[in-house]
């Protein structure tokens, strides 16, 4: 399977919000780097990280417009969005969307690194307005 095909499956599994299926495509030493440069290392830690994020934003989604492959690296340009849950409620005013890019490293058909580039201001504005605290 080409690296781009692996990443398309990874994006699809993010949209399914099934952390176990998502983890199946991560290498044991998977590395996640968020848009602030914070890193989570390891498949099991990232499985828990995704579970926490899907609790925080239960309808989180990603989409792609452009994908470029260079060897085992894949660059994805698209958008992400969802609704921030506040006290378990998904209110329309807590819906967000942001242009997003991802850079992935694929080895042996698994995602070894997933790096996010996004402007998180829409999420921060919702958190500030609602006094919501992410639960991870």
Can you say where each PLM-predicted feature lies in the sequence?
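Short amphipathic alpha-helical segments, especially helix-boundary/capping motifs
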Residues: 23-28, 40, 76-78, 100
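Short beta-edge strand/loop motif at the mouth of beta-sheet-based domains
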Residues: 29, 39-49
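A beta-strand edge to alpha-helix "cap/lid" segment located at domain peripheries
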Residues: 2-5, 9, 15-16, 33, ...
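Short, solvent-exposed secondary-structure junction/capping segments
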Residues: 8-12, 24-38
